[in-house]
From Swiss-Prot:
This is tRNA modification GTPase MnmE. Binds 1 potassium ion per subunit. NCBIfam families: mnmE_trmE_thdF, small_GTP. The keyword Hydrolase applies. Exhibits a very high intrinsic GTPase hydrolysis rate. Involved in the addition of a carboxymethylaminomethyl (cmnm) group at the wobble position (U34) of certain tRNAs, forming tRNA-cmnm(5)s(2)U34. (6S)-5-formyl-5,6,7,8-tetrahydrofolate binds at R23, E82, K121, K442. The keyword Iron-sulfur does not apply. One of its GO terms (biological process) is tRNA wobble uridine modification. GTP binds at residues 227-232, 246-252, 271-274, 331-334. The gene is mnmE. It comes from Mycoplasma pneumoniae (strain ATCC 29342 / M129 / Subtype 1) (Mycoplasmoides pneumoniae).
Length: 442
C-alpha cells in the first residue's frame, strides 16, 4: 500500500439506485477534484459543497454534493472527500474515469480503514471491528462489533499488557543486579500476578466458543410427511412463492432454501422432501437430502397435518438421537376444531403462533453474557491462546526453576502476543490478512 497515492472507491453497492457515494482520500484530493469541477473546491469554508462535475471538454457529467473532511479530522486521517452523485452506474463509471485520468488509483479492499489505523485514527481492534460490523449477520454480533469499535477490547487488555511489561522489566532488572534480589520472594509476587492475568485471559478465550456458533446463519429445517404443507409454510415465512405448492405427493425432491429476517436475526429456512414409506427412487434421494438438512439445522420444525396429528415415533427418536431441538407444529388448523399447542394454517398465512415461538427461541439462542468480553476475530483468539500458553509455561517452570533468564523468555513472549492483539508490534502480514477481507470503499 502506497499512502502517498490518492485513492478512490465506490462505497455503495454497484447497481442502479437513488444515489451513490464515491470516496476519495489522499494528499492530492483537492488537486484532483478541482480539475473535474465547475467551481473551486477548498478545504476551508463549507463542509458540504454542491458542484457540477465536468470532463476535459467542459461537458457536464453530474450535479453532485461534495462532503469534505480535512486532515487529520477524517476517517483515514487524510484529506477525504465523499462524492454523492445520482445513482446511475453510467454516471459512476464516468466519474471513476475522470478520477483515474487525473491520477487517483483504485483503493484496495479495506484500504480506507487501514490508512485510518496507520494514521492513528483507530486501534487495530477497532479497525477489525469495522468489517465485522458491516458483515454482522445478527444483532448479537453487531453489538459485539460495536463494543470493539468503542474500544472495549483495548480497554480490557491494556492494563494486562502494562502489568506484564512491568513484570518483564522487573525480571530484567533482577538479572542485571542479582545481588540485590531475593529471588524466592520475587517469584511468589510474580506468580500471583501471572495467575491473575492468566485467569482473565482464559475467561476471555472461553467466551469465544459461545460466540463462534453465532457466526454461521441460523438454519431451520421444515420436515414432515408429503403434502403436509411444508412448501406453503416456507412461502408464508418468506412472504413470497419460493417453493412450488402442489397437491401431488412428493413434489419437493430437492432442498428449497430461503432467507428472512426475524427480530434482527437472519434465518435460513430449508424446505425438505416429504417423508413417507412408499417412495420412488427420486423420492428416496430427496429424503436422504432431508436427513442431511436435519443434521446441519439448528432447529427443526416437524410439520403435522392437524387432521392426523400424531408424529412418527421413528422420526422423533432420530431427532433426539441427533440432539436436535424441534417444534411439533400442526398445520391446516383451519380444517379442524381441535386446538394444539402450536396450530397454524400455512395456506391462509395464519402463522403468528409459530413466528412468536421462533422469536422466543432465537432470543434465547443469541443471548450472551453481558459482562463477557468477546473477540469477534479468530486472529485475536489465536494470539491470546498463545499468550496463555506462555504464561502457563512460566507458572510450571517457576516451581522448579529460579533462573530468571529462562523464565523471562515466557513473559516476554506473552507480552508480545498481547501487544499484537492491541495492534502494537504487529507484523505487516497480519495487518494485510485482516484488511484483505474488507469490502471496497471501507
Amino acid at each position: 500500500m502506497d499512502t502517498k497515492q490518492t485513492m478512490f472507491a465506490l462505497a455503495t453497492a454497484p447497481f442502479n439506485s437513488a444515489i451513490h457515494i464515491i470516496r476519495l482520500s489522499g494528499p492530492d484530493v483537492y488537486r484532483i477534484i478541482n480539475q473535474i469541477t465547475n467551481k473551486e473546491v477548498k478545504p476551508l469554508g463549507m463542509r458540504i459543497q454542491r458542484v457540477w462535475l465536468i470532463d476535459h471538454n467542459q461537458k457536464k457529467v453530474d450535479d453532485v454534493l461534495l462532503f469534505k473532511f480535512v486532515a487529520p479530522n477524517s476517517y483515514t486521517g487524510e484529506d477525504l472527500i465523499e462524492i454523492s452523485c445520482h445513482g446511475s452506474m453510467v454516471i459512476v463509471n464516468e466519474i471513476i474515469g475522470l478520477l483515474l485520468k487525473h491520477g487517483a488509483v483504485q483503493a484496495q479492499p479495506g484500504e480506507f480503514t487501514q490508512r485510518g489505523y496507520l494514521n492513528g485514527k483507530m486501534s487495530l481492534n477497532q479497525a477489525a471491528s469495522v468489517n465485522n460490523l458491516v458483515l454482522s449477520p445478527n444483532t448479537t454480533l453487531k453489538d459485539v462489533a460495536l463494543n470493539a469499535l468503542a474500544g472495549q477490547v483495548d480497554a480490557r487488555l491494556e492494563p494486562l499488557v502494562e502489568k506484564l511489561g512491568q513484570l518483564v522489566m522487573q525480571m530484567e532488572v533482577n538479572l542485571d543486579y542479582p545481588e540485590y534480589t531475593d529471588e524466592q520472594r520475587e517469584l511468589v509476587t510474580m506468580n500471583q500476578a501471572v495467575v491473575q492475568i492468566t485467569q482473565i485471559l482464559n475467561q476471555i478465550v472461553v467466551g469465544q466458543d459461545q460466540l463462534q456458533r453465532l457466526k454461521d446463519p441460523f438454519k431451520i429445517a421444515i420436515i414432515g410427511n408429503t403434502n403436509v404443507g411444508k412448501s406453503s409454510l416456507l412461502n408464508a415465512l418468506l412472504d413470497q412463492d419460493k417453493a412450488i405448492v402442489s397437491a401431488i405427493k412428493g413434489s419437493t425432491r430437492d432442498i428449497v432454501e430461503g432467507d428472512f429476517a426475524l427480530n434482527g436475526h437472519f434465518v435460513k429456512i430449508l424446505d425438505t422432501a416429504g417423508i413417507r414409506q412408499h417412495q420412488s427412487a427420486l423420492e428416496k434421494a430427496g429424503i436422504q437430502k432431508t436427513f442431511g438438512a436435519i443434521k446441519t439445522a439448528n432447529l427443526v420444525i416437524y410439520l403435522l397435518d392437524a387432521r392426523q396429528p400424531e408424529p412418527d415415533p421413528k422420526i422423533i427418536a432420530r431427532l433426539k438421537k441427533l440432539k436436535k431441538d424441534f417444534f411439533l407444529v400442526h398445520n391446516k388448523a383451519d380444517l379442524v376444531q381441535q386446538s394444539f399447542q402450536v396450530s397454524i394454517s400455512a395456506k391462509q398465512k395464519q402463522i403468528q403462533p409459530l413466528v412468536d415461538l421462533l422469536t422466543q427461541y432465537l432470543h434465547q439462542f443469541y443471548s450472551v453474557e453481558q459482562n463477557q468480553l468477546y473477540l469477534i476475530s479468530d486472529w485475536q483468539t489465536i494470539l491470546l491462546q498463545k499468550a496463555i500458553a506462555e504464561l502457563e509455561h512460566f507458572l510450571i517452570k517457576q516451581q522448579n526453576c529460579l533462573f530468571f533468564d529462562i523464565l523471562v523468555v515466557h513473559l516476554r513472549a506473552a507480552h508480545e502476543y498481547i501487544l499484537q492483539v492491541l495492534g502494537k508490534n504487529t507484523n505487516y502480514d497480519l495487518i494485510n490478512e485482516i484488511f484483505k477481507h474488507f469490502c471496497l470503499g471501507k
